[in-house]
């Protein structure tokens, strides 16, 4: 198939991946037609028409270079990521993590793209895959039915799917502050989380209520398949009575403060279990329940989650919801630049490619956008080295075993191992991997 001769590039979808791709293309001097159907047609989960809206958590996760997603974020900053830049400008306290005011952040991304002289924003639903120009499809897991059919046809089948869910958000003014305390785990960074401690008796009662609560029904013909990083709390609870104690209710590093006067188990310094609340907006008026993605019916959410100490009278401004995520058979369909193997003028980006997470989705848009621009200019594709986070992620999703392929977060396990003797200390090993990654990335920057 010959390369398109159009004078612009299409980007379909203005989520995290599409917004990043559009920006990366436009900053290279190429006109972009950015299509977004919200404003004309709503999705079940989005609440606004803003670009790059965060529909689940407001956290971009860990910020340390000894954390793989922290390394990926630093690489993206060096590549001038619009998502990272606007995220930094709209940060809210989150200890050692990076969390944002979701509304302020999305509004700032939207304004920057709408005001870019080379980006034409078109609010319309796309139901056919364009063949008039190089095109980046970044319509995400909530792709409209009409376009999904066309994508599935291009991909030669139905692809794959899994379910993920969003956590509830509550009004801070309705929290009983006498029963909670402010602290970050291991006192990392500033104290940024409200912690709701539970005694063993409270936890056992909560676990019983959670595992017997009524869930909202799925379509009868679909099995329940979840991505481990966004598993509903009730599904986790049913795996075992202590499963949550090693997950979102882990008490380690969250000792009672000296001035805590609420219920506790004897003289123990650490609660039996802890539910953490994270600030959700810059004003600090909204908090989400960390790790409590759920598919319970709304009435059940209110009943069960008000058993959490401090939340007995909490007002829920948004209940948890669950949605179906579709993703492609990327190992068979895409190259490391997220380019279609069967149609070189077609790129895909975002969760539909099998990357999982906000940061990972934006990173895939960055890679696809850079390479769509390079194809437009008839330049050689840029494949980031596997020693970097931003190179290892596309390599993994396009080289995994297709039969067992599932969405993947960035992690040190997919980054190329260090040469020489293995560094036994994990922190030192991750620091060495990060140092090598950033040095190798700087070499790539010279090519851009």
From Swiss-Prot:
GO molecular function, one term: flavin adenine dinucleotide binding
Keyword Cell division in record: no
Residue pairs linked by disulfide bridges in the UniProt entry: none
InterPro entries cross-referenced by the UniProt entry: FAD/NAD-bd_sf (IPR036188), MnmG-rel (IPR002218), MnmG-rel_CS (IPR020595), MnmG_N (IPR040131), TrmFO (IPR004417)
Keyword entries, A-Z: Cytoplasm, FAD, Flavoprotein, Methyltransferase, NAD, NADP, Transferase, tRNA processing
Binding site for FAD: 13-18
Similarity comment text for this entry: Belongs to the MnmG family. TrmFO subfamily.
Task performed by this protein: Catalyzes the folate-dependent formation of 5-methyl-uridine at position 54 (M-5-U54) in all tRNAs.
Protein name: Methylenetetrahydrofolate--tRNA-(uracil-5-)-methyltransferase TrmFO
Source organism of the structure: Streptococcus pyogenes serotype M18 (strain MGAS8232)
Source lineage: Bacteria, Bacillati, Bacillota, Bacilli, Lactobacillales
């Amino acid at each position: 198939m010959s390369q398109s001769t159009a004078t612009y590039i299409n980007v379909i979808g203005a989520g995290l991946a599409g917004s990043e791709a559009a920006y990366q293309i436009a900053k290279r001097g190429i006109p972009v037609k950015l299509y977004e159907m919200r404003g004309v047609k709503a999705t079940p989960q989005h609440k606004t028409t803003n670009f790059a809206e965060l529909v689940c958590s407001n956290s971009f996760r860990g910020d340390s270079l000894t954390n793989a997603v922290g390394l990926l974020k630093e690489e993206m900053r060096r590549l001038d990521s619009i998502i990272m830049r606007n995220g930094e400008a709209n940060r809210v306290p989150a200890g050692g993590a990076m969390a944002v005011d979701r509304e302020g952040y999305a509004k700032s991304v939207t304004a920057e793209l709408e005001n870019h002289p080379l980006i034409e924003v078109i609010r319309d639903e796309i139901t056919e895959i364009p063949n008039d120009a190089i095109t980046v499809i970044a319509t995400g897991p909530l792709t409209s039915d009409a376009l999904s059919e066309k994508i599935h046809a291009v991909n030669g089948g139905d692809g794959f799917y899994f379910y993920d869910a969003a956590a509830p958000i509550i009004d801070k003014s309705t929290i009983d502050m006498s029963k909670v305390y402010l602290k970050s785990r291991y006192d990392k960074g500033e104290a940024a989380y409200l912690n709701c401690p539970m005694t063993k008796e409270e936890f056992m009662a909560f676990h019983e209520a959670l595992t017997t609560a009524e869930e909202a029904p799925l379509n009868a013909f679909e099995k329940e398949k979840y991505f481990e990083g966004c598993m509903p709390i009730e599904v986790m609870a049913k795996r075992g009575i202590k499963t949550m104690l090693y997950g979102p209710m882990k008490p380690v590093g969250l000792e009672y403060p000296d001035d805590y006067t609420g219920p506790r188990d004897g003289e123990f310094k650490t609660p039996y279990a802890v539910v953490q609340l994270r600030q959700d907006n810059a004003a600090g008026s909204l908090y989400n329940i960390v790790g409590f993605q759920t598919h319970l019916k709304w009435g059940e959410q209110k009943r069960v989650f008000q058993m959490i100490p401090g939340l007995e009278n909490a007002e829920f401004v948004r209940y948890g919801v669950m949605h179906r995520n579709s993703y492609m058979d990327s190992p068979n369909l895409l190259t490391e630049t997220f380019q279609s193997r069967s149609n070189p003028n077609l790129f895909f980006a975002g969760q539909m490619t099998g990357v999982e997470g906000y940061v990972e989705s934006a990173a895939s848009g960055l890679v696809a956008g850079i390479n769509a621009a390079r194809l437009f200019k008839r330049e050689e594709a840029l494949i980031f080295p596997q020693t970097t986070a931003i190179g290892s992620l596309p390599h993994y999703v396009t080289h995994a075993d297709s039969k067992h392929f599932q969405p993947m977060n960035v992690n040190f396990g997919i980054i190329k191992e260090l040469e020489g003797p293995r560094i036994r200390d994990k922190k030192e090993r991750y620091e060495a991997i990060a140092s090598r990654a950033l040095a190798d990335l700087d070499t790539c920057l010279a090519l851009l």
